[in-house]
């Protein structure tokens, strides 16, 4: 009973976080160029489905304060396009800006697009990826949802199946996830990952604010 109450509390806190920052993101007019300066490793932000980069602004601000130049992809908009298309946007951005040694910082679906980009023609431009709450193995809830665009996250979805075969890039990925994710009951552990970081909390969104995320980016930046 106590366990169920704890999960319910996590669920409520998670959606409160999501609603608050989605609302803030809808009205925020911060210029992305304000985060482009810095001498640390360059970071490229990949938000989740129905999220713009502004949803991740608390994390972006914290990373920029630590010296990282931050790059965002306005072309992704709310990241509703197929994973393959999102990965192509990532590759085109890296090529157009001649970026190298980039670390991807991704949330949820953004991690799927990031992994596909790492395996693509521009993969050598990417040093590593920190993926937060990414459904690498899919989610059995996907097919139960009334939105067709979310069915792609089913464990049997073509993109999920394809990504599972791309084992060679896993060693460059750090997967950070909560002990309880209401969206991904299977969890986000990635076989062969550079590191799997399981945080003893619950949530799919508010885990973006966990200090371990910043700590793991720092480790990737140093190595």
Roles of regions detected by a PLM:
Residues 169-223:
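C-terminal catalytic-base region of ester-bond hydrolases, centering on the histidine
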Residues 43-54, 58, 62-172, 176, ...:
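Serine-dependent carboxylesterase/thioesterase catalytic core
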Residues 32-33, 166, 200:
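Hydrophobic alpha-helical segments, principally membrane-spanning helices and signal/leader peptides
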Residues 1-45, 50-73, 92, 96-99, ...:
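Flexible, membrane-associating and regulatory peripheral segments of lipid-active enzymes
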């Amino acid at each position: 009973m106590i366990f169920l109450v704890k999960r319910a509390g996590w669920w409520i806190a998670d959606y409160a976080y999501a609603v608050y920052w989605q609302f803030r993101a809808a009205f925020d007019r911060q210029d992305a160029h304000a985060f482009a300066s810095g001498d640390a490793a360059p970071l490229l932000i990949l938000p989740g489905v129905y999220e713009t980069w502004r949803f991740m602004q608390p994390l972006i601000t914290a990373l920029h304060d630590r010296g990282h130049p931050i790059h965002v992809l306005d072309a992704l908009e709310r990241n509703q396009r197929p994973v393959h298309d999102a990965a192509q946007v990532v590759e085109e951005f890296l090529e157009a800006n001649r970026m190298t040694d980039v670390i991807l910082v991704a949330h949820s679906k953004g991690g799927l697009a990031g992994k596909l980009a790492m395996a693509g023609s521009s993969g050598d431009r990417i040093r590593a990826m920190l993926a937060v709450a990414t459904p690498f193995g899919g989610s059995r809830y996907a097919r139960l949802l009334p939105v067709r665009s979310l069915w792609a996250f089913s464990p049997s979805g073509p993109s999920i199946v394809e990504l599972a075969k791309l084992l060679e890039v896993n060693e460059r990925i750090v997967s950070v996830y909560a002990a309880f994710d209401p969206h991904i009951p299977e969890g986000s552990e990635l076989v062969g990952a550079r590191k799997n970081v399981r945080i003893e909390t619950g949530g799919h969104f508010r885990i973006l604010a966990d200090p371990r995320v910043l700590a793991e980016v720092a480790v990737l930046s140093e190595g």
